[in-house]
């Protein structure tokens, strides 16, 4: 690989933001884009009811509800680093899609609400990051409101999320008494001013905590700060880059995203310390980003990003080599050679054609139904990247068509939406009712809305008497026997795999006991 290409890889930072709904993820996303020059004006959360909606929330239903339902990709440049930010669905129902986004990043930013502390969605997402040893930085948001004691928050993060905290900045007061933060490593006092552009009144470089200017600026709050820092030095962990990169320690910043305060300090540390593109595990070997041959995997399919064109785009994470427009690659699953002429990069709704891209970059490739989640593009090697699963759904609905003449359109719509991976579809071995399965119930609303607006299909749901699903594999003869005996509970999923839908956990356990020669899987790697 050329020196130039190596430098390009080292400049890349690819990450996602994880948080509980309403912790401020959309706001901090926009402020990062603002610093990166990718947008000129932040679509403030408070202005959501007006015509301007958050740049990263572009689907119609998201605009109506003020939540991020889809995951989009945004690219910006900051201090000569190329940053790829993958926006994850913020609503707690969208964990499956969020999980797959986390397979495509090298690090994550965790946003914690200073008022509410650690919440359930954050715990789930951090568990996913922990499986992959993903390095995590933390931003404690909403310091401009009356929140919880920062020591209490640090303690909660360590105990609940089981990760060491290394405070990088420390708040001076909060709510009405919020004066700013003190940077423990640069010894800078960052003054908060809600009226100032980007929330920062001034940054004062101090010789240390005994600098007399501290008292001049902060008055009685200077003594509070000195007391806090003294406590921290005894109790908190100092920042260790090795522990951070291993996913064992999280550097913690405090601020107020809506006021753009504290975001720059976070971003500076992020580009300097977050990992460049990391090696990726494939079935046969580990793939280094510095290898010459191109390799990439699809982690997301998004249909109808442009309502005018009814298109579908597959999002690919480049793992090695260099992408150039027009290059021919092997679509491994299909054993077919394809030329990529129309790859795009994203800035929320805006797309631009890409002439070249490097490991860590996310490119979008137009897709007419041939690309599936987990597919690999290579220069010929039979590679299959691991760790991009489907999860067994926990909620099920029967789909009833209101117009019987639309059955073909229904099949097309359900199949395409399932290929995006937020819901799964199951066709019965016996009977006509399609079943939609989802990890979270909000996805059913999304499917109904999109069937009507994108496929012109009106349908209703009826409850389906199922509680869980498992994919079933085993010897051909045994599978045939199983399908005969359990025909009313056997379905074929959107990729042609046999699935068993059970009405209760007891029923599933009982069936598994009766069919010990078969394997029942709660997750399934994309084929």
From Swiss-Prot:
It comes from the Bacteria. The keyword Cytoplasm applies. Gene3D superfamilies: P-loop containing nucleotide triphosphate hydrolases (3.40.50.300), Peptide chain release factor 3, domain III (3.30.70.3280). Keywords: Cytoplasm, GTP-binding, Nucleotide-binding, Protein biosynthesis. The keyword Cytoplasm applies. GO terms for molecular function: GTP binding; GTPase activity; translation release factor activity, codon nonspecific; translation release factor activity, codon specific. It holds the Pfam family GTP_EFTU. SUPFAM superfamilies: EF-G C-terminal domain-like, P-loop containing nucleoside triphosphate hydrolases, Translation proteins. GTP binds at residues 19-26, 87-91, 141-144. GO terms for biological process: regulation of translational termination. It is found in: Cytoplasm. Residues 10-278 form the tr-type G domain. One of its GO terms (cellular component) is cytosol. Signal peptide: none annotated. Belongs to the TRAFAC class translation factor GTPase superfamily. Classic translation factor GTPase family. PrfC subfamily. Increases the formation of ribosomal termination complexes and stimulates activities of RF-1 and RF-2. It binds guanine nucleotides and has strong preference for UGA stop codons. It may interact directly with the ribosome. The stimulation of RF-1 and RF-2 is significantly reduced by GTP and GDP, but not by GMP. This is Peptide chain release factor 3. It comes from Geobacter metallireducens (strain ATCC 53774 / DSM 7210 / GS-15). The gene is prfC.
């Amino acid at each position: 690989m050329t020196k130039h290409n190596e430098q390009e890889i080292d400049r890349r930072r690819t990450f996602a933001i994880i948080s509980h709904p309403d912790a401020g993820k959309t706001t901090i996303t926009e402020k990062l884009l603002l610093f990166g020059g990718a947008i000129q004006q932040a679509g403030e959360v408070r202005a959501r009811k007006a015509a301007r909606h958050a740049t990263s929330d572009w689907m119609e239903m998201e605009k109506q509800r003020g939540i991020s339902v889809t995951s989009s990709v945004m690219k910006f440049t900051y201090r000569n680093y190329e940053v790829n930010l993958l926006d994850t669905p913020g609503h707690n129902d969208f964990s499956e899609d969020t999980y797959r986004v986390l397979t495509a990043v090298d690090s994550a930013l965790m946003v914690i609400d200073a008022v509410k502390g650690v919440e359930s969605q954050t715990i789930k997402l951090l568990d996913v990051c922990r499986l992959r040893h993903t390095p995590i930085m933390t931003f404690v948001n909403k310091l401009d409101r009356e929140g919880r004691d920062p020591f209490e928050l640090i303690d909660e993060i360590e105990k609940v999320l089981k990760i060491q905290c290394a405070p990088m900045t420390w708040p001076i007061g909060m709510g009405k008494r919020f004066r700013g933060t003190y940077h423990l490593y640069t010894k800078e006092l960052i003054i908060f001013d809600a009226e100032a552009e980007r929330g920062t009144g001034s940054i004062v470089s101090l010789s240390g905590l005994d600098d007399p200017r501290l008292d001049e600026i902060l008055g009685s709050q200077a003594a509070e700060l000195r007391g806090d820092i003294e406590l921290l030095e005894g109790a908190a962990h100092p920042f260790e880059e090795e522990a951070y990169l291993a996913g064992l320690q999280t550097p913690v910043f405090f601020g107020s995203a809506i006021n753009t305060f504290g975001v720059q300090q976070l971003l500076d540390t992020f580009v300097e310390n977050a990992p460049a593109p990391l090696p990726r595990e494939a079935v046969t070997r580990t793939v280094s980003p510095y290898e010459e041959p191109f390799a990439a995997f699809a982690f997301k399919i998004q249909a109808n990003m442009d309502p005018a064109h009814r298109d579908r785009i597959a999002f690919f994470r480049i793992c090695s080599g260099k992408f150039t427009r027009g290059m021919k690659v092997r679509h491994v699953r299909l054993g077919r050679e394809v030329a990529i002429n129309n790859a795009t990069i994203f800035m929320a709704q805006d797309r631009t054609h890409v002439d070249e891209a490097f490991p860590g970059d996310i490119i979008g490739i137009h897709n007419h139904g041939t690309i599936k989640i987990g597919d690999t593009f290579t220069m010929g090697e039979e590679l299959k990247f691991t760790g991009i699963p489907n999860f067994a759904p926990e909620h099920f609905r029967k789909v009833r068509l209101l117009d019987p003449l639309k059955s073909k359109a229904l099949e097309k719509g359900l199949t395409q939406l399932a290929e995006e991976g937020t819901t799964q579809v199951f066709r019965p071995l016996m009977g006509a009712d399609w079943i939609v399965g989802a990890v979270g119930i909000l996805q059913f609303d999304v499917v109904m809305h999109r069937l009507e607006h994108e496929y012109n299909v009106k349908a209703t749901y009826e409850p389906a008497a199922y509680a869980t699903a498992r994919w079933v594999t085993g010897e051909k003869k045994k599978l045939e026997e199983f399908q005969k005996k359990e025909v009313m509970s056997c379905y074929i999923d959107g990729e042609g795999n046999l699935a068993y839908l059970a009405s209760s956990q007891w029923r599933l356990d009982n069936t598994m006991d009766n069919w010990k020669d078969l394997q029942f899987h709660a997750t399934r790697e994309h084929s």
